[in-house]
């Protein structure tokens, strides 16, 4: 859930031979894929309206867009707004303006939190994890920079928008934090080098699953007033799938930065991702109530899967850009 | 405060500044409930869609990081019951919270912790340009209300007033000779300085 949605040429799932034996009902038709594209275009504009005033008020330097960071933030927030749409309708609630804004704010929050953890070196990563844990355990966050001010303003707005002490939402937030910390420890520690290959792959797969699986649950908690317990497993599955798709798309840039993921360590990543995609989609389709939210989620995942396969293919050719695919 | 900065952002950021003004470090709000959830009687495995009793040996090791603690079994979760531990109503428990009472104690704790600072800030803010603007805005809002809406608002304000009086009374009776502000001094409920 932590990288922007790259969108490319629209193609149906069937044209890529994505069939499930005995059940092809899940496959989105071209109208459903087109709806995803339309929503993405609309949300892109809405996200700018929703985020720019806060960025201007707290961290105007970001608008100068050094390294395309602001655009990346908008893209991630757009993707989160769209996934939030699917989650909200899956949970049985209309996706109104206020809920859309919550989806957008959560995207912005994830982008900034990821930047704290990824972009300022190992010492800063550890310190940020400690400070975020302090925020979660005491509510205190010592704001030191404009970027942190923007982060805290967004977090506090999200926390005020929902009952953050709801038992499921607060557990999802803590589970997401723990997943993020395990992922970071894995990257920064030495233990990973001595693990047998099989164990390493299991660990990487679970890490990917948990990070995005819990993130989508938090997102749902912020866009929907209540989540029925029976929806948690399929939502978790959807989140895990998004992370694997993301990791495949970012394969070459992750390898350049020394970041191991399940999808950049398996022997045949494209075939592995295809198998994961089909398995996860089948579980999702069977586990979710038949409604517009489910259809939107499946269409988005299919679209995302296809575009990230394309991104992976392009990056293999010109492996000099981490963010090669934009519309 | 810049023109585009929402009032909520300002309040949230100002609250963080209060941290350094506490005589004793105390939490503002604790979202972390890991300890309570680890001890909840049921654990819902979101990776495998299975509801277990706490400590069930059938919980897969790969699911340990995807468990949600539950105190009661919602009707829709019964379909996911683990066949090994067979979770049932007999183990249901109350969550470690007490509903409305928690809110009352929460309000008391905020008043006790930050009462003097909030009052001081309120005075400063009322006299600032933004505060005057807000006061004018609220007056305008009140003037534009229909009679019925005004009556409703009055009922709400009266109820709030009654609630605050009740809280103050409760505070006095709970306080009775012991301090609850954690620093050994009698609670002043915001009247004294908390330097």
Which functions belong to the PLM regions below?
Chain A
Residues 115, 119, 218, 222, ...:
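Generic, well-ordered alpha-helical scaffold segments in large soluble proteins
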Residues 2-31, 181-219, 305-327:
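C-terminal intrinsically disordered extensions
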Residues 125-156, 196-210, 255-288:
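Divalent-cation-assisted or electrostatically stabilized phosphate/pyrophosphate-binding catalytic cores
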Residues 142-171, 271-316:
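Primarily interfacial, aromatic-capped hydrophobic alpha-helices that serve as membrane anchors
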């Amino acid at each position: 859930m932590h990288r922007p949605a790259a969108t490319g040429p629209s193609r149906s799932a069937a044209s890529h031979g994505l069939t499930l034996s005995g059940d092809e009902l899940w496959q989105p038709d071209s109208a459903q894929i087109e709806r995803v594209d339309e929503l993405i275009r609309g949300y892109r504009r809405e996200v700018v309206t929703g985020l720019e005033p806060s960025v201007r008020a707290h961290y105007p330097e970001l608008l100068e867009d050094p390294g395309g960071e602001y655009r990346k933030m908008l893209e991630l927030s757009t993707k989160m707004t769209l996934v939030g749409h699917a989650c909200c309708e899956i949970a049985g609630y209309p996706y109104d303006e206020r809920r859309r804004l919550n989806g957008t704010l959560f995207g912005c929050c994830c982008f900034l939190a990821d930047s704290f953890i990824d972009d300022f070196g190992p010492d800063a990563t550890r310190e940020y994890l400690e400070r975020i844990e302090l925020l979660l355990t005491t509510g205190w966050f010592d704001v030191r920079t404009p970027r942190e001010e923007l982060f805290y303003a967004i977090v506090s707005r999200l926390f005020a928008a929902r009952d953050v002490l709801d038992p499921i939402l607060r557990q999802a937030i803590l589970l997401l934090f723990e997943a993020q910390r395990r992922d970071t420890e894995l990257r920064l520690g030495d233990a990973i080098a001595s693990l047998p290959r099989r164990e390493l792959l299991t660990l990487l797969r679970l890490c990917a699953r948990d990070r995005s699986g819990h993130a989508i649950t938090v997102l749902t908690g912020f866009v929907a007033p209540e989540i029925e317990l029976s929806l948690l497993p399929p939502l978790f599955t959807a989140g895990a799938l998004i992370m694997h798709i993301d990791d495949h798309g970012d394969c070459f840039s992750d390898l350049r930065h020394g970041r191991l993921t399940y999808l950049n360590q398996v022997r045949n990543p494209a075939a592995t991702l295809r198998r994961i995609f089909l398995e996860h989609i089948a579980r999702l389709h069977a586990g979710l109530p038949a409604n517009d939210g489910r259809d939107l989620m499946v269409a988005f995942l299919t679209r995302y899967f296809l575009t990230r396969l394309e991104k992976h293919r392009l990056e293999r050719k010109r492996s000099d850009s981490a963010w090669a695919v934009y519309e | 405060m810049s023109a585009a900065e929402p009032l909520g952002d300002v309040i949230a950021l100002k609250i963080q500044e209060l941290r350094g003004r506490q005589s004793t470090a105390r939490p503002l709000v604790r979202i972390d409930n890991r300890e309570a959830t680890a001890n909840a009687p049921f654990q819902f495995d979101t990776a495998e869609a299975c509801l277990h009793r706490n400590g069930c040996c059938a919980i897969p090791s790969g699911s340990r990081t995807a468990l949600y603690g539950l105190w009661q079994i919602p009707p829709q979760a019964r379909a996911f019951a683990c066949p090994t531990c067979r979770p049932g109503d007999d183990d249901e428990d109350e969550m470690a919270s007490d509903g409305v009472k928690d809110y009352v104690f929460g309000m008391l704790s905020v008043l006790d912790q930050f009462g003097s600072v909030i009052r001081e800030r309120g005075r400063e803010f009322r006299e600032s340009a933004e505060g005057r603007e807000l006061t004018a805005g609220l007056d305008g809002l009140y003037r534009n209300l229909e009679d019925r809406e005004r009556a409703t608002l009055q009922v709400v304000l009266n109820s709030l007033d009654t609630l605050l009086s009740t809280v103050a009374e409760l505070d006095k009776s709970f306080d009775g000779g012991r301090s609850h502000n954690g620093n050994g001094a009698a609670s002043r409920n915001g009247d004294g300085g908390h330097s």
